[in-house]
Amino acid sequence: MRHHGKILTAGLLAAVLWSGAAGAETILSRGNGGQPETLDVHKSVGIPESWIELDLFEGLLSPGPKGELVPGAAESWTVSDDGKTYTFKLRADGKWSDGTPVTAGDFVFAWKRFLDPKTASPYGYFIDQVVNAKDIRLGTKPADTLGVKAVDDRTLEVTLVGPTPYFLATLTHHATFPLSRANLEKFGDDWVKPGHMVSNGAYMLADAVPQSHVKLAKNPEFHAAADVKIDTVNYFVTEDVDGELQRFKAGELDYTYTLPNQQIPDLQKTMADEVRIVPYIGTYYYTVNLTHEPWKSHPELRHALSLAIDRDVMVGKITQGGELPAYTFVPPGMSNFAAWTPKEAGETQAQRDAEAKELFAKAGYGPDKPLSVEISYNTSENHKKIAVAIGAMWKQKLGVDTTLTNLEWGTMQSALRKKEYKDIGRTSWIGDFDDPSNFLDLFRSTAGEQNYPGYASPDYDKLMDAAVVEADLAKRGQTLAQAEQLFLADQAIIPIYYYTSKRMLSTKVKGWQDNVLDNHLSRWLTVER
């Protein structure tokens, strides 16, 4: 899905809360990390955007209370015997927030827009398994050749290039949501603004104030509106993790986006009932800019920096939230994957340090030729502390001089996509669904802007292409493992740890169910005041 990313003054926050607090209205206040870049479902990337979009829109399928797949805009579907053709029957009562019906044509329109090279969606590769999708987004075939057809207003047919075990799971993702063609044609790029946006989910966009909040109101046209208990949802920008915690303690937030790492041990003692730390399918990593030297042609240099990071210290002393050291990109426990263990994962840190020094010297660096590195990260004390610790490890073991540059969430995401970060950039990937392809597709040469290092390997692409058409799940898992081994041997990124989701959750919030994708749609929750 996705990437992790000024908080309101107390007075302004209170004003936002009060503005929707008339009568018996139920309000949920969510800490949401960084400022959302956009609410255009085809152009957004990060978690701050995706959580809001999951409340605003509904795909063919939807994440249920436990993160499981449940019917969304489609009430049912069938799959052909060869596993290549999916036929979806849309709900008769599916409506846009303006009262017009949601049709199969809305999905066809949206998917064509999604793949249009002019849209330049960072997620364009996401439905490459659909017939001709890849060629359309690369501009080599016209949009009308896409393997998606509106048989009638309530019947959508999708044809794939081969059996795809995870296809249904992709349909909960914001990139595959429908859009109202009439709405986009009326407002153009301004369709995402409050008062303009038409959505088909449980909520409508009521207000959006940059660096402050996004306010959603219950959608009376939603097919399950009678079951939605929360009337208003406020998503607050909370890049200041310490400030976010203080506002939670003051009762201004019902739950937080994350926790200050250094305060986790104390919080687990003093506020144990409200601390939630659970497994999460995601990897925190540093990406290396391969568009220029010295990174472009020195894999041994990149590998040396990776080996010199003591990941056990990182998760034990710095993050302190139950994270696990990462030596691969695909998190442990993912389905349809032949899990493997890199050599360095079984070594001591002393062995890794010795190898790092050898590789560093082999790359031509040392006391007579020192290396200077800039680490860029999005604003967060948590990210800063990690970067400081890693810089200290590199200095102590390899003599590397490190400078830190922090950027606001949107600026950092732009720098990553455009390869404008100088040397190394902090980022992460959180699984959109339980399949390793969701992680490994990022580094195809045709993946576009989300290929942050600018990695390109014909051999890697061939393995990933082979996995797409492999019907045998065991063989497919082995092929994907081979692709990851090749990719990590090239060391275009530096995995650091596997995530846990960690936050404060008020005991007043009911209906919350932990899940490894950390999807918690507001429609499934309620708040007892």
Task: Mark where each language-model region is.
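Alpha-helical secondary-structure segments
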Residues: T103-A110, D153-T159, P163, G201-A202, ...
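Long beta-strand-rich cores associated with HINT superfamily self-processing modules
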Residues: R503-R529
